[in-house]
Swiss-Prot record:
It is an enzyme of class 7 (translocase). It is a multi-pass membrane protein. It comes from Emericella nidulans (strain FGSC A4 / ATCC 38163 / CBS 112.46 / NRRL 194 / M139) (Aspergillus nidulans). Ca(2+) binds at residues 425, 427, 429, 431, 436. Belongs to the MscS (TC 1.A.23) family. Gene3D superfamilies: 2.30.30.60, EF-hand (1.10.238.10). Pfam families: MS_channel_2nd (PF00924). This is Mechanosensitive ion channel protein BA. The keyword Nuclease does not apply. Residues 14-37, 760-781, 827-842, 886-904 have a biased composition (Polar residues). SUPFAM superfamilies: EF-hand, Sm-like ribonucleoproteins.
Length: 943
């Protein structure tokens, strides 16, 4: 049943025609098979699978068109087999390749026999049928005999040159093992040595065979003919040229061997040793956890880099494969089994070869072979590192220690265990984390690859140098050849020298560049392939090294830069890859007022950071901070010295470590805290802006406000809204007897800081209150709810104020017009002093606007301290009148501006408290603190 709340019910939908309701092919649909015998999914499951046959060939394929024909590709050349003109090896080429795969003796017999048989025919004919036949005065058999000797001696000399290195290594290796390296030179000089030996044999056998053969001796014709002398000179010239060629090749090989020994020998040995140690660890890991076990199945598949062994045989979870995959899965399983069986057979043959030769020969299952192959790729290197680390580390630990390696390798291999641990513990902190071992093994593989690339590029540079020297040797050989052939040797030398002198001006720059490049590359050699260098303050990665130039990649933007070696020979080059643990210095500018204690606190914070467990693998525990400058006496320049535990060869690692340290440095500076330069001046400016104004408050008021204040309390303009709304006052309208007005304004309010006394505001004829005197303060009690009644029994002119007791401050009746604080009257301990601003503003008011002074508990004190004086108020009564008539001095309640001032007002007054009824009590006792008897007496008198 559809959901009635579904918003898609009433949406009109357009009907779309289709062949079926589900959109899939009907089972009755017939799809023709491919005529080419291709794979058709529909052919296998034509009736069972719902979508079977959807990938089969279209009907047009049955007609022979619509598709590209298949072409057979040769695996060796990568070219179609039907196009021999594109460089495909012909049958003769395939035969030659088959011959090259034969043994040395068989191959040489194949080389020698055909031509030797052809040369033997004239010899046989001259010895049997044409005995009198001669060539240049030499009988036919002996002439072709010398040619046969020349041809056969070429291959014999080649065999001798091939055997010489082994003989030299066997003989000289017994005397000194260090001389074995020269066997490599002899092996590389096989062709030059062959040419020299061949020329020697040809020259030595020419005259004896041509001139001094037995037939000439019988005939007495032993004189050397002119053409024989010329041939002898030519052979001698060829011998000299062969010697020059041999010398040039020997020089190149000596440069190559000495250079490789100087630059790469130590690195090659270290790389081989590291691979051997990793092989030991991997072999121990395999002994604990066999290959392809459930713990390391994926890692072993990655290490072996085999598609057949990688991944599970089943599909993804929740996905069932169709039956069409069963044959492929069967083939895959067969291939897996065949591959493993083949590996076992190869391993068995390798074990036999190891027993015979003592070396690992074609043993693909050997640990060293697997490690060497795994280090070629980053992914397999990481898998190898994970397998070793996880198999060695005990459960519950987060790092690999030396005792773990010793325990796994067993007794008697403590030296190998320590060497393995030293190789992997690059930071030297005593433990190896998973990230650290991955980084170490990946670095070993990367070093191995860069070393191979460096050797290859240097070999290319040496090859270029070889070609250059070979060109020079060829020029010299031509001169030597000409000198031996012609009679005027001096004339030829003079002509050649003149030619070289004229060409020296043309090739002077090139010769200088070549010589400088050779010195830079083979003598100095400041970098290798893959090194991170800095040239003219720009970081680069070396990509290629040639004889005359080098190619770099910029680290910042990946630009490729080519620089001539003669230019690099004149600049400073910083090589980060060849450096050990590096130090970094950062300069920060701080405030000039920074103290030594703050600098030491900053150093402690940074040392805490570098010594934490997360960072001790990257940085050394020591940090240097020094004051390197003071600028223009406005700042301090601090230099922070940070010691890394590795170099900066890997840019990503260096950038991550530097970013982490910079964030920690900023956090430490904020935590101390250390201010930036100029922070003190900014604080002083902010303090000046926040300083209170010393001028009176009335001076800052607008002129209109000042004029209203100076006019006195008779002309108030602005009501004070700061009074609390909980005070009460009552107004009685004379026109309406019994009517009472309640207004929520108050005449008592606390002043901000001026608590030395309180002032009651005057009641004017206009029944308004002036703002400066609307505020009064009730100390400590906060009593703002006292009702005050205003009546009309006394006129405003003869109005008296009632003194009310407020805790420790006793308020006596006073003249409202004076409003001044008496000198010598101090506040009590529980009152806060008035602020200077308030006091100054009060003193700046006119005399008739000053607030009344605070009153003392005893009236006698006031009479002694303050003599009677004439009030400055315009009212007719004096200060003494208020104390002489306490019963008639009724304190009015202030009112707000909310009531109607146009109505006639009647004020009620509360009678003053009788002092005699409060004997034994201080006159400033609050009625709320009285006893019941005192309260009743007070209420009766008040009413």
């Amino acid at each position: 049943m559809p959901n009635p709340n579904d918003v898609t019910i009433d949406i009109p939908l357009t009907s779309v025609s289709s062949r079926g309701q589900t959109g899939a092919r009907n089972n009755s649909t017939n799809i023709p098979n491919s005529p080419s015998g291709g794979y058709s999914a529909g052919a296998e499951h034509n009736g069972g699978a719902e979508k079977g046959g959807l990938t089969s060939s279209p009907p047009s394929s049955s007609l022979g068109f619509g598709h590209r024909r298949r072409r057979t590709i040769n695996d060796k050349t990568g070219l179609p087999a039907e196009e021999p003109e594109d460089g495909t090896v012909t049958r003769m080429g395939r035969f030659y390749q088959a011959v090259l795969n034969f043994s040395t003796v068989t191959r040489y017999l194949i080389y020698i026999a055909p031509l030797a048989a052809l040369l033997a025919i004239p010899i046989i004919v001259g010895a049997t049928a044409a005995e009198d036949a001669k060539i240049g005065g030499v009988s036919l058999p002996w002439f072709f005999c010398w040619v046969e000797v020349v041809w056969v001696s070429l291959w014999v000399c080649k065999l001798v040159a091939k055997v010489i290195p082994f003989v030299f290594q066997f003989v000289c290796g017994i005397v000194s093992a260090g001389t074995r390296k020269y066997a490599l030179i002899l092996r590389n000089l096989e062709i030059p040595i062959t040419m020299v030996l061949w020329m020697i044999v040809s020259l030595v056998t020419f005259l004896p065979i041509m001139v001094y053969n037995p037939r000439n001796k019988r005939e007495g014709d032993t004189e050397t003919k002119s053409w024989e002398k010329s041939v002898k000179n030519v052979l001698f010239a060829f011998l000299v040229c062969a010697l020059i060629f041999l010398g040039e090749k020997t020089l190149v090989q000596l440069i190559s061997i000495s250079y490789h020994r100087k630059q790469f020998d130590a690195r090659i040995k270290e790389s081989k040793r590291n691979i051997n140690l990793i092989g030991i660890l991997y072999d121990a890991s395999r002994s604990m956890f066999p290959m392809y076990c459930k713990e390391f199945r994926e890692d072993d598949a990655i290490i072996s880099d085999s598609i057949l062994l990688g991944g599970p045989e089943t599909g993804r979870p929740g996905h069932s494969r169709s039956n069409s995959a069963a044959p492929l899965r069967f083939i895959r399983g067969v291939q897996q089994n065949v591959g493993r069986i083949g590996g076992k057979i190869t391993g068995a043959l390798g074990d036999v070869a190891h027993e015979i030769t003592g070396k690992q020969v074609f043993n693909s299952s050997a640990a060293r072979s697997i490690v060497s192959e795994a280090l070629e790729r980053r992914r397999s290197s990481e898998a190898l590192a994970r397998r070793i680390w996880m198999s060695f580390v005990i459960e519950g630990r987060e790092a690999l220690y030396l005792d773990d390696i010793m325990e796994v390798l067993g007794a008697g291999k403590e030296a190998e265990a320590e060497e393995c641990f030293t190789m992997l513990d690059r930071d030297g902190n005593g433990d190896i984390s998973l990230d650290e071992i991955i980084l170490a093994i990946s670095e070993i593989g990367r070093t191995r690859k860069t070393l191979n690339h460096s050797v290859h590029d240097v070999d290319q540079a040496i090859h270029v140098l070889d070609n250059l020297l070979a060109t020079i040797a060829f020029i010299i050989a031509v001169l030597v050849f000409v000198s031996f052939v012609t009679s005027g040797f001096g004339t030829v030398i003079a002509a050649g020298a003149t030619s070289l002198l004229s060409l020296s001006f043309v090739f002077a720059t090139t010769a200088q560049e070549v010589l400088g490049s050779c010195i830079f590359l083979f003598v100095k050699h400041p970098f290798d392939i893959g090194d991170r260098v800095e040239i003219d303050s720009k970081p680069y990665i070396v990509q290629r090294i040639s004889l005359l130039y080098s190619v770099f990649r910029n680290v910042n933007d990946n630009r490729v830069t080519q620089i001539p070696n003669v230019v690099l020979n004149t600049v400073w080059i910083d090589n980060y890859s060849r450096s050990s643990a590096m130090q970094e210095k950062l300069t920060i500018e701080v405030n000039i007022d920074t103290t030594t204690e703050e600098i030491q606190a900053l150093k402690d914070e940074i040392e805490t950071f570098v010594r934490s467990p997360d960072n001790k693998r990257d940085f050394h525990p020591d940090v240097d901070i020094e004051v390197s400058g003071v600028g223009a006496l406005d700042k301090l320049e601090l230099t922070v010295g940070l010691f890394h535990k590795s170099n900066w060869a890997i840019e990503s690692v260096r950038a991550a470590r530097r970013s982490k340290f910079m964030v920690a440095l900023v956090a430490a500076v904020k935590k101390v805290p250390i201010r930036t330069p100029g922070a003190a001046a900014e604080d002083a400016a902010a303090a000046d802006g926040d300083r209170p104004d010393d001028k009176p408050d009335d001076a800052e008021q607008p002129p209109a406000r000042q004029s209203s204040i100076s006019e006195g309390i008779r002309h108030p303009t602005v009501p004070d809204d700061s009074f609390p709304s909980d005070s009460k006052s009552t107004g009685v309208d004379l026109g309406r007897p019994g009517s009472v007005q309640r207004r929520g304004a108050s005449a008592t309010a606390a002043t901000g800081n001026n608590s030395a006394g309180s002032a009651y505001s005057e009641t004017t004829l206009n029944n308004t209150v002036s703002e400066p005197y609307q505020r009064s303060f009730t100390p400590n009690t906060g009593d703002r709810d006292t009702d005050h009644y205003h009546g009309s029994m006394s006129s405003p002119v003869t109005e008296r104020h009632l003194g009310v007791s407020h805790d420790s401050i006793a308020r006596k009746a006073s003249t409202a017009s004076t409003g001044r604080r008496r000198a010598g009257i101090m506040t009590t301990a529980n009152q806060s002093l008035a602020s200077p601003t308030t006091m100054q503003s009060e003193s700046a008011l006119p005399p008739h606007l000053q607030p009344p002074p605070p009153l003392q508990p005893s009236s006698s004190q006031y009479s002694q301290q303050y003599p009677q004086q004439q009030s400055q108020s315009p009212y007719s009564y004096t200060y003494s009148e208020r104390y002489d008539q306490p019963e008639s001095s009724l304190q009015p309640l202030e009112h707000t501006t909310s009531y109607n001032q146009s109505l006639p007002q009647v004020y009620e007054y509360a009678p003053a408290a009788d002092r005699n009824s409060l004997e034994g009590h201080s006159p400033h006792v609050d009625p709320r603190h009285m006893t019941e008897e005192q309260r009743r007496n007070y209420e009766s008198r008040r009413l």
